[in-house]
């Protein structure tokens, strides 16, 4: 897990799995043995890799770790211990396992996935072809190379090595998306301490955003505030805070993207709403966050969990929105994903395919006291930028706030806790990438077919041996 941000030692991803394949998995001939050694490997990985969850919910961490372990261990247990199909089976198993992790439990827990560990390595660019699962497949190819080098199977290294080199070269050769316009954009970080809960007074957060914005001098076409940067008691359309933001957008002559904590009329629930405000006409559009954070914005199985956990920080549950994350503005359509949604490539894809020419990501990581979650959120933004061929503007309350180019380069980045406005020229783009056009399903289906073939081949070999 040291390949993951904030450590970012990307070679340890394929090297760690490759060493496990060579010295733990390779001799396991029976399916049960392979399942046991795979489960032991991933249990250790997720006990550490998902430990950040304990700051949000210890019961959630206890529930998630064994489920995540089993999800990754099961596909790897189907990979034969030897034979020519092993080299394809390992990448396929990793792809299939991670694809399932994006769906279950609790609607998916894609944090600490293998692709995040490669954003500082040479395979980041391949996300333009096949998204994060394509990057994960190359981690599997790299692991096979390490395994065969350790076994001194020199000749068997050739085709995996060709794949590991050729795919990134093909990604570099792919034409870029079309630049439609260049604008000056700013992302605002209000600042503050880490490790504060979600009930930090909304007024103080809003005032810190206003102070940072007012202190910034210069012309801005587009400005993005962080998640929960303001609030409303009841419908935000009638709130004083919206009127204040409309006045601010008009005064700065900028399109303003801000996020509201909107309490429902019954005060028992809330909506996480991101709005677009035009300088001339005021409120232009809104998007209500559709993929909610389990144990953060709602409690799965609340009646079961409540006797064993303090749920006072989640006294209100969020109401999920519907539809793609895209906001219509005077600059054109802007794709938006709120906070945790940036980890889900399909959500960003939906917003971009609905017309988004740039991606805005208001986020909030102040509930966590370390840099693990902020750095993984930034890594996710880098992956989403490459996949979509779009600039990504990530605005976090306490960091990291960043501007990311379509090749995954972080052109501007804040430090944690500081109050700052980051500004620069960005491009509004159109056009498709292969990852946008195809989505994740072709690679998932291919991985499933390869694993099914591995199982079938192993069964035939066993039948011949017994006969």
Predicted stretch roles:
Residues 1-173, 370, 381-384, 396-401, ...:
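Membrane-embedded alpha-helical bundles of multi-pass enzymes
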């Amino acid at each position: 897990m040291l390949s993951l941000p904030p450590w970012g030692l990307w070679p340890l991803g394929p090297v760690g799995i490759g060493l496990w394949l060579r010295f733990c998995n390779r001799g396991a001939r029976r399916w049960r043995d392979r399942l046991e050694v795979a489960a032991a490997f991933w249990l250790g990985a997720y006990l550490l890799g998902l430990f950040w969850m304990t700051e949000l919910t210890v019961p959630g961490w206890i529930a998630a770790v064994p489920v995540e372990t089993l999800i990754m261990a099961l596909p790897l247990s189907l990979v034969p211990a030897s034979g020519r199909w092993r080299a394809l089976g390992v990448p396929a198993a990793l792809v299939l396992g991670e694809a399932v992790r994006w769906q279950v439990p609790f609607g998916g827990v894609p944090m600490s996935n293998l692709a995040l560990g490669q954003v500082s390595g040479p395979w980041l660019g391949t996300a333009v072809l096949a998204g994060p699962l394509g990057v994960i497949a190359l981690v599997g190819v790299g692991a096979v190379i390490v395994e065969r080098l350790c076994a001194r199977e020199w000749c068997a290294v050739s085709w995996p090595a060709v794949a590991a080199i050729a795919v990134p070269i093909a990604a570099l050769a792919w034409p870029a998306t079309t630049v439609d316009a260049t604008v000056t954009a700013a992302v605002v970080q209000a600042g503050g301490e880490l490790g504060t809960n979600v009930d930090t007074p909304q007024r103080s957060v809003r005032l810190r955003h206003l102070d940072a914005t007012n202190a910034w001098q210069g012309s801005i076409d587009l400005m993005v505030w962080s998640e929960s940067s303001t609030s409303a008691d009841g419908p935000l359309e009638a709130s004083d805070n919206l009127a204040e933001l409309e006045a601010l957008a008009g005064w700065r002559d900028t399109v303003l993207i801000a996020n509201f904590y909107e309490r429902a009329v019954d005060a028992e629930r809330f909506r996480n709403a991101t709005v677009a405000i035009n300088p001339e006409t005021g409120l232009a559009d809104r998007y209500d966050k559709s993929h909610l954070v389990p144990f953060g914005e709602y409690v799965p199985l609340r009646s079961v969990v409540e006797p064993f956990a303090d749920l006072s920080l989640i006294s209100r549950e969020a109401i999920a929105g519907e539809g793609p994350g895209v906001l219509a503005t005077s600059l054109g359509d802007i794709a938006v994903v709120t906070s945790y949604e940036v980890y889900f490539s399909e959500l960003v894809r939906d917003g971009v395919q609905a017309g988004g020419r740039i991606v805005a990501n208001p986020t909030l990581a102040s509930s966590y006291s370390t840099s693990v979650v902020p750095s993984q959120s930034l890594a996710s933004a880098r992956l989403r930028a490459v996949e979509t061929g779009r600039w990504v503007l990530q605005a976090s309350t306490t960091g990291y706030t960043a501007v990311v180019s379509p090749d995954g380069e972080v052109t501007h980045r804040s430090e944690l806790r500081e109050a700052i406005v980051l500004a620069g020229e960005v491009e509004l783009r159109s056009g498709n990438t292969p990852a946008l056009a195809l989505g994740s399903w072709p690679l998932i289906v291919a991985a499933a077919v390869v694993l099914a073939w591995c199982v079938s081949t192993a069964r035939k070999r066993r039948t011949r041996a017994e006969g």
